[in-house]
Amino acid sequence: MAEITISIENENFIQVNLQPDQTVEDLKRRVEFETTILVNNQVLTLDGKVLDNEKKLSDYSIKGGDFLLITKNVLRAPQQRSQQPQQPQQPQQPQQQRQPQRDPLNSPQDILDHFTNNPEDLTQVINSNPALANAILSKDMKFLTHFVEQIKEQRRIQELALKDPYGEEYQKLAYQHIQQQNIEKNMQHAMEHTPEVFASVYMLYIECSINGHPLKAFVDTGAQQSIMSEKCAERCEISRIIDTRFHGIAKGVGTSKIIGRVHSTDLKLGNSLFSVSLSILQNQDVDFILGLDMLKRHQVILDLNRGVLQIANEKIEFLHEKDLKEILNKEQNDLEEDTKKATANSLSPSTTSTTTTTTTTTSPQTPTNATSPVNNNNNNNNNNNNTRPPINSPPVAKTPQPTPQPTTNQYASESNIQTLIGLGCSRDKAIRLLTQAKGNVDVAASMFFG
């Protein structure tokens, strides 16, 4: 069978089997299948002449090997619609020929029926839209339902444009569409020129010991003071020297109770010993945070090029991912639990897995008179009201691993996740792709198929 070539906006090209008896509108519907450009948005031209939807391809003497051009032009649709009532009634025979042809985009079942009866169309869809073709072959009703809903939404927007292009509702939708296009272009630019920004970044950890107990310290230049959890202080046997006069509430991304302060204890980095002051927090996920107080005091150099922390004459290597499995697994479970709680309580969505926010506050005041019980109590009250020690969010895990329970976020809705799973994508990867695609399931599917 002869084929014709159709250029889409001079960017993409598709091959279509030539059927001289079919109308121009039928040809546009086939193009709509492969490009999702609505029929009303298509302007089909041959040698610069616009083709009429009502006429057959044979009326324009179109033959195999001809080259047709399709451009998107929303403004042409109202003119065509307005001209239709003025046209005299055509003979009944052409209309009767088109009556049996149903719009295959009305429902998922219509799509399946159409491609079952037209295998040559399915072959073209396999080449142009693999995700849709896979859904048709596997009879994935969820994917097809979503596809039909998208087409109907596009048609609704088109109807609004025809009815009142300057109306508030259409202008709002048009603005959202333009904004989404700009976002997609920005993301595509980033994926092409700086793909590394989509990779997970691991926090900086080093090996150290507190009071002779080995620890993995989280190096955080955004933490104003060095912090330790209450449980870690017990393991390091320094709970007995916690000064509870420095208790209060630490406020940052969240809140945590400060039970006190250890004014000085031994910190071993490499082969050197340093004195460190610690704020002890009751509910702190990270065992030990090496804060800016120590980093500035000892003029620490964070050499990210060589992957080392230089303090005095010591050079301590930052830990690699393989050394942080226990920490990352714990943080991953915490992240999933927080996401479930946030979803259940309809709270604001949390940050994505590739973002970690660090917030610090001012340090506590030193008691003015440690020998007077009265002064101690007064200073204790002042610390409760005015003291804001540092608190920073724990580093977030790389990527959630598959779990029996569904995990969603603001971009990865359960329906979109199931759509990608139906394409053969794992749940974990589906969530990550939807997050990167800002919830656009089509973009996520394209990323999955490469």
UniProtKB/Swiss-Prot annotation:
SMART domains: UBQ
Domain called UBA: residue spans: 411-450
Bias-annotated ranges (Polar residues): 104-116
Chain intervals with Low complexity compositional bias: 78-99, 343-386
Residue ranges occupied by any Ubiquitin-like domain in the UniProt entry: 2-77
The keyword Protease is assigned to this record: yes
Pfam families per UniProt: Asp_protease, Ddi2_HDD, UBA_4, ubiquitin
Gene Ontology biological process: ubiquitin-dependent protein catabolic process
Residues forming coiled coils: 321-346
EC assignment: 3.4.23.-
Residues at the catalytic site: 220
Classification via Gene3D superfamilies: Acid Proteases (2.40.70.10), DNA helicase RuvA subunit, C-terminal domain (1.10.8.10), Phosphatidylinositol 3-kinase Catalytic Subunit, Chain A, domain 1 (3.10.20.90)
Keywords: Aspartyl protease, Coiled coil, Hydrolase, Protease
InterPro entries attached to this UniProt entry: Peptidase_aspartic_DDI1-type, Peptidase_aspartic_dom_sf, UBA, UBA-like_sf, Ubiquitin-like_dom, Ubiquitin-like_domsf
GO molecular-function term, one example from the UniProt record: aspartic-type endopeptidase activity
Region of interest called Disordered, as start-end residue ranges on this chain: 78-116, 335-410
PANTHER family, A to Z: ASPARTYL PROTEASE DDI-RELATED, AT13091P
Physiological role: Probable aspartic protease.
Family: Belongs to the DDI1 family.
Protein name: Protein DDI1 homolog
Gene name of the record: ddi1
